[in-house]
Design a protein with these regions (language model features):
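A structural motif
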Residues: 49-52, 79, 121, 126, ...
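Glycine-rich, proline-tolerant flexible connector loops at the mouths of alpha/beta enzymes
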Residues: 54-74, 133
Length: 346
């Protein structure tokens, strides 16, 4: 088994993670699979061999029934589950969302799935359950009453929070993952600020259980600065999880290897995480491209990990006093040049 990747001087939990969906069969909206699908539990040893200490999964990938076997296998591999997440986007029943659907029967099913996922999260030993906003949104104006949709989100997350608090105390926390669009034209919980406001509207007892799982590509699709998104989460004490990848412009969600498209901003991100003493696991949400052969399917993960380690060690060497000096002197162009030297220099 490969030696797990670690980050030098990382505070708290060390080791990297990736999702079982990261090494899928290569299907996209314009074409079917280019590789044979790999059984989900067979993907855990592959992630371990790629140097991952943590795995992540949706409830349609590792089901509640599979969870005990997955937990046992993970222990054997020396892995842990970093996060578990219910899929509110794949099944046809959730074509117009789960919590925000106009159909009360669909909302009821979504809540049942969410509560079941809380139980499975505990079985897998994960500390975090993620809610991605997937199909919670609209394609046509006035298709939903936006104020009602917001109230349904508050009501839904309150139910989940109270259920978890009653049954598991603070054993499980919840990280909402914002995205502005895709698969919907417009999505609720589109950005970090929107999610922070949503959390502020939850019942006081459950607010401490809710935070965020920001993803690089999701911020960049919206034309936002991912570093600032992370800083905002940190300032609010709500950075519960993180997904790293790369995004080449404001296009479809590409899930490219971390460090590929904007390495200088990625360097700055790691400076921020180091200075904040971020103690959680660092995980990737990347996707093996259609063109990769089955034997190379984990390249997307190992390339991301090596880029992260290289940038992390560069970030450790960034002189924070120099940054402060550039700020005091208002030499911000010079600051950008210094960061470039830190990135590209010896």
């Amino acid at each position: 088994m490969a030696t797990p990747y670690t980050l030098k001087n990382k505070v708290g939990i060390n080791g990297l993670g990736a999702g079982v969906w990261n090494i899928g069969p290569g299907a996209d909206p314009f074409g079917g699979p280019t590789r044979d699908p790999i059984p989900m539990l067979d993907r855990l040893p592959m992630l371990a061999e790629a140097g991952m200490s943590f795995y992540e999964a949706h409830d349609v990938e590792i089901t509640a029934e599979m969870a005990p076997k997955a937990a046992k296998l993970a222990r054997k591999l020396g892995m842990k589950c970093a996060m578990y997440t219910p899929s509110f986007f794949a099944a046809p029943i959730f074509k117009d969302g789960a919590m925000t659907s106009n159909d009360p029967a669909v909302r009821k099913l979504g809540m049942e799935n969410a509560l079941k996922a809380v139980d499975t999260t505990v079985v897998l030993g994960a500390k975090t359950m993620v809610f991605w906003n997937g199909r919670e949104g609209f394609d046509f104006v006035l298709a939903k009453n936006g104020r009602d949709a917001f109230k349904r989100l508050v009501e839904g997350f309150n139910k989940v929070g109270h259920y978890a608090r009653k049954n598991y105390g603070t054993k499980v926390k919840f990280a909402i993952e914002p995205k502005p669009n895709e698969p919907r034209a417009n999505m609720y919980m589109a950005n970090v600020g929107e999610v922070l406001y949503l959390i502020s509207r939850l019942d006081k007892e459950v607010q401490p259980l809710f935070g965020l799982n920001p993803e690089t590509a999701h911020s960049r699709i919206a034309g936002l600065d991912f570093v600032w998104d992370i800083e905002l989460c940190l300032e609010a004490g709500k950075l519960f999880h993180i997904h790293l990848n790369s995004q080449d412009g404001q296009r479809y969600d590409q899930d490219l290897p971390f460090g590929y498209t904007e390495p200088l901003k990625d360097l700055a991100l790691l400076v921020v995480l180091q200075d904040a003493k971020y103690a959680g696991p660092i995980c990737f949400d990347v996707k093996a491209p259609r063109v990769d052969d089955p034997k190379n399917i984990t390249d997307i993960i190992t390339v991301s990990a090596r880029n992260l380690i290289w940038l992390w060690e560069r970030a450790l060497k960034v002189n924070r006093n120099k940054i402060e000096q550039f700020r005091r002197q208002n030499r911000l162009t010079a600051l950008s040049g210094y960061l470039a030297q830190c990135l590209y220099g010896r």
